[in-house]
C-alpha cells in the first residue's frame, strides 16, 4: 500500500503518494484542480490532476472512466500521455501526466505569434487529430487552453473528458462556445470528427489575428457572428436542421453574403487563408480532414507523410452506452488502474516504442 501525503491547495485537499513533492497549483478546471509536482522516481516535472468526487454520481463516474480509458489508449507525440494514476484514501482519482509549462491560450494573450510558430503549432494539432480521429474518437472540446506547449514548442492536446465515439447520432452540449462547430448549434446531433476541424480553424484564425474569431455572447449571437463572415448557410445545410425552433431561427436571420477572407484577414498569407477557408466550412461533409490539412501547401515545411501515423486500433466504445451504478463504475475503474500499473514502468514502455511518431524539429526563434 502506497504512503500518502495530505496537502491543502486553494482550499482543496490533495492526497498524493510520497513519490510526488513540491506541489504548486497551475490551473482549475470544471472537473478538477491541476498542480505541478516533482516526480522523485523519474526526476521529472509532472502535472497532477485531481478529479473531484469521481464516484459521487454515475455520470461523473462514467466521465472519469472514459477519460482514463482514452488516456490509456491514445499514445501519440501530440497527445498528452498518462504516466501514473492512483485513487487516494478519500477516493479521489489523480491523473499524472507530463508537464508542458504553458498552453496556447496563455501564449496568445501574451504576444503575437510569428508565421513559423503558427505553422508549427497548427501542424502538430492536425497531426494529433489525424491520429485521434483514426482511433474513432472526436475530442469535442478543442480550444487554446486545451493545447499544451513546452519551451521547445512541442505541442500536446489534452483534456479528453468530453471526447466521444465518432457516431452520426451524437448528442450533447459541448465545447467552449467560441470554438463550437455550427452543426452542434444547429442540430444537436449528426456530428463527427469534422467538429474538431472547425475548432482547429477557429484556433488557427486566433493565432493569425491574436483574438478569438467568433466571440459570441450567447448561442444565438455566436451563430449570427459566424454568418457575418461565412454568409447564410447553404440550403442543403439548413435542411439538415432537426429542431423546428432552430430552423425557424436560422430562416429568420437576414440573408448575408460571404466576406472574402482576404478582407477579414488583410495581413495574412493567401496560402494560410486557403487552408483556413477549407476548415471553416458550414457543411461538415465538405470540411477538410486532418490528413488533408497536413498535406496542404501551408504546412509543407513540416509535412512528412511517413511520420503522421494513425492509431493501430480503433478505441473500444462498448462501455459508452452502459447505464451502470456508481459501484460498478468504481470496480471497472480499479480494474483499469491495476491494468495500467501491470503494464510496468511507463518510461520502459516508451523506450520500447509505444508512443507513435516523432515530431519534427521546432522552428528557430
From Swiss-Prot:
E.C. no: 2.7.11.24
Enzymatic class: transferase
Residue positions, PTM Phosphotyrosine: 173
Activity modulation comment: Activated by dephosphorylation after osmotic stress or in presence of the fludioxonil fungicide.
Phosphothreonine, modified sites: 171
Pfam family for this entry, one: Pkinase
CDD domains for the chain: STKc_Sty1_Hog1
Annotated consequence of substituting residue 50 to N: Confers resistance to fludioxonil
Residues that coordinate or bind ATP: 26-34, 49
Catalyzed reactions per annotation: L-seryl-[protein] + ATP = O-phospho-L-seryl-[protein] + ADP + H(+); L-threonyl-[protein] + ATP = O-phospho-L-threonyl-[protein] + ADP + H(+)
GO annotation, cellular component aspect: cytoplasm; nucleus
Keyword Signal carried by entry: no
Cofactor: Mg(2+)
Positions of the Protein kinase domain: 20-299
UniProt domain comment: The TXY motif contains the threonine and tyrosine residues whose phosphorylation activates the MAP kinases.
Protein name as it appears in the record: Mitogen-activated protein kinase HOG1
Provenance organism: Cryptococcus neoformans var. grubii serotype A (strain H99 / ATCC 208821 / CBS 10515 / FGSC 9487)
Gene from which this protein is expressed: HOG1
Amino acid at each position: 500500500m502506497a504512503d500518502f501525503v495530505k496537502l491543502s491547495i486553494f482550499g482543496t485537499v490533495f492526497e498524493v503518494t510520497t513519490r510526488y513533492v513540491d506541489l504548486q497549483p497551475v490551473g482549475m478546471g470544471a472537473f478538477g484542480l491541476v498542480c505541478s509536482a516533482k516526480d522523485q522516481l523519474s526526476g521529472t516535472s509532472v502535472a497532477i490532476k485531481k478529479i473531484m468526487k469521481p464516484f459521487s454520481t454515475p455520470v461523473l463516474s462514467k466521465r472519469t472512466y472514459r477519460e482514463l480509458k482514452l488516456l490509456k489508449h491514445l499514445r501519440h507525440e501530440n497527445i498528452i500521455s498518462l504516466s501514473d494514476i492512483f485513487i487516494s484514501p478519500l477516493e479521489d482519482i489523480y491523473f499524472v501526466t507530463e508537464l508542458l509549462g504553458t498552453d496556447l491560450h496563455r501564449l496568445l494573450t501574451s504576444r503575437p505569434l510569428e508565421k513559423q510558430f503558427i505553422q508549427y503549432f497548427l501542424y502538430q494539432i492536425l497531426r494529433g487529430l489525424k491520429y485521434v480521429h483514426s482511433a474513432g474518437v472526436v475530442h469535442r472540446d478543442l480550444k487554446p487552453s486545451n493545447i499544451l506547449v513546452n519551451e521547445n514548442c512541442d505541442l500536446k492536446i489534452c483534456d479528453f473528458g468530453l471526447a466521444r465515439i465518432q457516431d452520426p447520432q451524437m448528442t450533447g452540449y459541448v465545447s467552449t462556445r467560441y470554438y463550437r462547430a455550427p452543426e452542434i448549434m444547429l442540430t444537436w446531433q449528426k456530428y463527427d470528427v469534422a467538429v474538431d476541424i472547425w475548432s482547429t480553424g477557429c484556433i488557427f484564425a486566433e493565432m493569425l489575428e491574436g483574438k478569438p474569431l467568433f466571440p459570441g455572447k450567447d448561442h444565438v449571437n455566436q451563430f449570427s457572428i459566424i454568418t457575418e463572415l461565412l454568409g447564410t448557410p447553404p440550403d442543403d445545410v439548413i435542411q439538415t436542421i432537426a429542431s423546428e425552433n432552430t430552423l425557424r431561427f436560422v430562416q429568420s436571420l437576414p440573408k448575408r453574403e460571404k466576406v472574402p477572407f482576404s478582407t477579414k484577414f488583410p495581413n495574412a498569407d493567401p496560402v494560410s487563408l486557403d487552408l483556413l477557408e477549407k476548415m471553416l466550412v458550414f457543411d461538415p461533409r465538405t470540411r477538410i480532414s486532418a490528413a488533408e490539412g497536413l498535406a496542404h501547401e501551408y504546412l509543407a515545411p513540416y509535412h512528412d507523410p511517413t511520420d503522421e501515423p494513425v492509431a493501430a486500433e480503433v478505441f473500444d466504445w462498448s462501455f459508452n452506452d452502459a447505464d451502470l451504478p456508481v459501484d460498478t463504475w468504481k470496480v471497472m475503474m480499479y480494474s483499469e488502474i491495476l491494468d495500467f500499473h501491470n503494464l510496468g514502468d511507463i518510461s520502459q514502455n516508451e523506450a520500447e516504442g509505444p508512443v507513435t511518431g516523432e515530431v519534427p524539429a521546432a522552428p528557430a526563434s
